[in-house]
Amino acid sequence: MKKRIFAAFAACALLLSGCAGGQTAEDTAQDTDAANGELRELTVVLDWYPNALHAFLYQAEQAGYFAEEGLTVNIQSPAGVNDAMSMVAAGKADIGLYYQQDVIQARVEQDVPVKSIAAVVQAPLNIVLSLKEKDITEPADLVGKTIGYAGTELSEALIHSIMKESGQDPSSVEMIDVGFDLMSSMVTGNVDATIGCLVNHEVPQMEKEGFEVNYFFPDDFGVPQYYEGIFLANDDMIENEPEVLAGFLRGCQKGFEDFKNDTDAVLQVLLDNQDESNFPLDPDVEKQSCQTLLPLMETADAAFLSQSEACWQENIDWMYEEGLISTKPDISEVMATIDF
């Protein structure tokens, strides 16, 4: 998976410093286009390269669902790990697909002016993953073991939390920063397990390569349930153009309905839009990923794109307890309600 980091948001600061107040020439041009009945262009920056999680977006654009809302959506892969947040914060993009805990920390520690407008995945995808031969199925099995991770504070906090919740000493686990090499560090025996792999990506990929694996979810062991992906927008857009955001979300909803009803056809739309030169997709892996994602993107208790104050508060409380944030923000500082 893409390396997640809680960064010092220097990129945000640099971009924001270049933004003057008031309406830009681009804004004026867009207002004129809207008045003339032309489509309003939106730029959406993904969290990672195009994959099964994003299939509904490509379907919504291709099927004309965004056009029905007066929108044309330019879907971009990120050039840097923080682009989905930093570009949106600076007004260089309209909407980003990013991560719940990162938004909370960015708001608290750097006052980055973004909020979540919708939850794309209603449950975590992040797992503790190991080869089956290691016989690791719960936190207690990690005692005396090595865990590979991407050097992030979040991964450290997740392991600390699940070990503590299970009555184990967190220091009994050795955390090893393996950077991006999560899978290879496991299969070569450099570490016993990893945290940071995704159930919808690394699991089907490793299984296709012939590896038997075990995994468990941190939220089964004391970590609060959280949204693996959220759409975010900046404060100005939320205040001044909520109807544009609502139209975008309606288009996404229609794309997701197609994704549910004809998964193979929508997957083909994704494959037709893959970044083949940089990140070629394996159709078998992405098909299995779709089957994993669909019941997590919409559940019996939560509609697609819905988000709850309770989930945000539980994660704020947990992050504060784990020392990931210095103060607890109001929910209104990190989450916005867009009626669509």
Task: For every predicted segment, state its role.
Residues Q101-D102, D181-S184, N190-E276:
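Pocket-lining segment of extracytoplasmic ligand-binding domains
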Residues N74, N82, D220, D284-Q291, ...:
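Short linear loop/turn motifs
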Residues M1-R40, F340:
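Short, low-complexity disordered leader/linker segments with a strong preference
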Residues A310-F340:
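Conserved C-terminal helix/tail region of periplasmic/extracytoplasmic solute-binding proteins
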Residues E239-E322:
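Secondary-structure end/capping motifs
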Residues Q30-D177, S185-T188, D192-N200, F216:
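Short, glycine-/small- and polar/acidic-enriched structural segments
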Residues P170-E174, E276-S289, S326-E333:
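Short, surface-exposed acidic
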